[in-house]
Amino acid sequence: MSGRGFSRGGGGGFRGGARGGRGGGRGGFQQRDMGPPDTVLEIGSFQHDVESEMLCSLTAPTKIPYFNAPIYLQNKTQIGKVDEILGPINEVYFTVKMEQGMLASSFKKEDKVYISGEKLLPIERFLPKPKVAGGKVEKRGAQGGRGAPRGRGGAGSRGGRGGFSSRGGPGGRGGARGGAGGRGGFSSRGGGAPRGRGGFRGRGQ
């Protein structure tokens, strides 16, 4: 990926938001495609090809494309569909799985790609919701004390993991997941960098 990878900062809540967006995108494609739309909007610019797919940077900063949304040229010729969405909130990329007969390597850097306006979601759908201060948060924190009776929270109970064990009770487990969500960025497939694509992660589960 030419040195590009995920940013650990730059916005939170993308892990859960991206999955919700994927579900919405799939729901929109239950019906058969009815040909090109009346109008298309610029959605990205081509950066380079990756394993026969196009890697594009998002040029519509307030919109996120559906997964599997058709991608067009300006003349409404369909060239592929959105395959993956990658990166943090301030530097979003997406890949395009090519239609039969189309070659990602035939495009030039910064060539524009287009999408139907009906296949876009507002970026607010992927932003973290404000935390609500109150008794509920305190109750969840208190549950962490249950880890001690189970023997998982004590020092050295698992070969030196001590109180920092990631498996130390409901409170600890919830906290770990919350922290990971706050790192932000689209993370579709989970896990490391698949198929040799550098820092980018793959499809959603």
Swiss-Prot record:
Ranges for the region named RGG-box 1 are 4-28
Residue ranges for the region (RGG-box 2) are 152-204
- Alphabetized UniProt keyword annotations: Nucleus, Repeat, Ribonucleoprotein, Ribosome biogenesis, RNA-binding, rRNA processing
Q: Where is this region: Disordered?
A: 1-38, 132-205
Gly residues bias spans: 1-28, 142-197
Q: Which domain of life is it from?
A: Eukaryota
Pfam families given in the database record: Gar1 (PF04410)
Instruction: Please list the GO terms describing molecular function.
Output: box H/ACA snoRNA binding
Q: Where are the transmembrane segments?
A: none
What GO CC annotations are associated with the protein? box H/ACA snoRNP complex
Q: Where does it reside?
A: Nucleus, Nucleolus
The Gene Ontology biological process annotation of the record reads:
snoRNA guided rRNA pseudouridine synthesis; snRNA pseudouridine synthesis
Q: InterPro entries in the record, alphabetically?
A: Gar1/Naf1_Cbf5-bd_sf, H/ACA_rnp_Gar1/Naf1, Transl_B-barrel_sf
* Cited function: Non-catalytic component of the H/ACA small nucleolar ribonucleoprotein (H/ACA snoRNP), which catalyzes pseudouridylation of rRNA and is required for ribosome biogenesis. This involves the isomerization of uridine such that the ribose is subsequently attached to C5, instead of the normal N1. Pseudouridine ('psi') residues may serve to stabilize the conformation of rRNAs. The H/ACA snoRNP complex also mediates pseudouridylation of other types of RNAs. The H/ACA snoRNP complex mediates pseudouridylation at position 93 in U2 snRNA.
Its family remark reads: Belongs to the GAR1 family.
Quaternary structure per UniProt?
Component of the small nucleolar ribonucleoprotein particles containing H/ACA-type snoRNAs (H/ACA snoRNPs).
Q: What is the name of this protein?
A: H/ACA ribonucleoprotein complex subunit GAR1
Species classification:
Eukaryota, Fungi, Dikarya, Basidiomycota, Agaricomycotina
Name the encoding gene, please: GAR1
